[in-house]
Each structure stands twice: as structure tokens, then as C-alpha cells.
Amino acid sequence: GRLGWFDRWFCSPSNHRVHHAVNDAYLDKNYGGILILWDRMFGTFKDEDAQEKCVYGTRGLLNSWDPLWANAEVYAGLAHDSWHARSWLDKLKVWIKPPGWRPADVAERFPKPAFSMAQMQIFQPPMSRAVQWFALVQFAVLLTGVGAFLWQADTAPLAHNAIWFAVLLVGQWALGAVMQGRISMLMALMLQSAALATATSALGLTEWHWLFKPLTMAIAIILVATSAYSTSARGTSGSKTPWVLLMAALGGSLAGDVFLMFPGFFIPGLVSFLVAHLFYVALFKSG
């Protein structure tokens, strides 16, 4: 919809739709994040045309839910062209020329297919109902976490912000990987729990660390057990010894973590870790 006078001054939904569209008429338009007045002044404004629906996306299809790659993909392309350009001047111009510019020799050796609106397809890898619910819950939790992070970021020390930023990044990457089918839901939970265990340890949040570190080990044991079961169910040949050794090593590590949480249990904790290391050594020797 349109918002009348608001559209003329501010970055309204209509104006921002144009910014995210790949249609020829809308390309590189409406940069203003708050005031659209700047685009009107500098000639980059384009009003949304009711006869031409905005098609969202990028001209180089990302085809990924990876938040890291979504931010790095453009720079990776620039670095590729800069590296392969034969002229030193072209190596520099890659970084300062308008979007889409490429050295002639690079474009000849590494041609890109011409953009076509017919190629614009929604990136929608198949997801089971369980993964869809997992993604919904995870997104709600991550959105809450990002909100809490932004709320306190200006008063927290830089080191604390860096740690929590890394935790949120791991969480978002893991969720995207699950949605693409690259890792399982259990693997994502293990990575997220490990990130929280590391963060709470670094920040001295002992009680929370006592929760997340054993939880990480417990999820790892379940992950190994389910992997061993699925391998056995598929009838894949091979010894079960490595699986048993790995589960025993993880179990010993988990026991060591739990023992060390309580005063007076240092020796049992130390013994548990030593036993776990013996199982790890046996696992490595088994190949």
C-alpha cells in the first residue's frame, strides 16, 4: 500500500520495496534508510510502479541461508576479480568502480551468465515439518537474543559484546545450515550449546557454564549414538568399535565435567577425564 505524504519524505514500505527489487527499472534506487529525501535530491529515487511488481533478491543468486556467506559473497567476488586481474590498476579499480564493473580480461576468462528475470526463483530447499517447527522456535529465540544484545550493547564492555555477537552468529549459522539440510537439528543444538558454554566460561558466568558444558557433552553423546544407529540400520559395513570408543570418551568427559562442579570431587573428576583420554587415544589408534 501507499502512505501519501509519508512516502514523499521517508523510507516507507513502498520505497524500500523498490530498493530490494532486481527489476531493471528499480535497480540501484532508493538508498535512504530513513529519509527518502536524499534520493530525490541526488537522482536515485524511483517511485513504485503499480504496473511492475517488485521482484526481490539479488542479481547474483545467493541460494543460501548462511548469514556469513550472505555478507561475504559480494566481497569474495570482488577479491576473486581483483586477484585474477592482470593490470595492477584494474586490481584497484575493482574495489572503487560502480557495482557490476569487471576488468575486461577477468570477464573474458570468468564470464557470468546474463541476468534474466526468468531465472529468479525462490530459494526454498525442502524441509520436513519437524525442521520447520525447529526453525520457527529457533528464529524466535534468536530474535529475542538479538533484541537483548542490542538493548545492552551500548553499556556493555566491547569484549562482552564481541563474545555475545559470536554466540548469536553461531546460532544463526547453525539455523541456516539446518534449513539447508547441511547439518542435523541435534548438531545445531550441540554447536549452539557449545557456543554458550564457551561464552559463559569466558564471562565468568559459572552457574550457566555448569549447565551448558554438560549439556553440550550430553547432546554430543546422543548425536554419536543416533549416527551409530543410523549407520547400523543402513547396513553399512564396518566395525562398531570406533563408535563405542567415541561414546565412552564423551561419557567420561561428561562425568568429569559433572564431578568438577561439586567441591570435594576433584579426584573423581580427574580420573574421569583420564579415562576419557584413554578412550580417545584408543579411538585414534583404531584409525
Question: Model-predicted segments: where are they?
Answer:
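Cytosolic/stromal cytosol-facing helical appendages immediately following the last transmembrane segment
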Residues: R2-Q138, G176
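Polytopic alpha-helical membrane-helix bundles and their juxtamembrane interface segments
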Residues: L189-G287
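Alpha-helical hydrophobic/aromatic positions enriched in membrane-embedded helices and signal peptides
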Residues: W5-F6, L35, A174, L205, ...
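Substrate-recognition/cap regions that form aromatic- and gly/pro-loop-enriched pockets
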Residues: P125-L191
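Perimembrane helix-loop junctions in membrane proteins
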Residues: D47, F149-A153, V178-G181, S227-R234, ...
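Hydrophobic alpha-helical transmembrane segments
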Residues: A76-S82, F110, Q138, H160-L168, ...
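Short hydrophobic alpha-helical module
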Residues: M41-T44, L143-A153, L278-K285
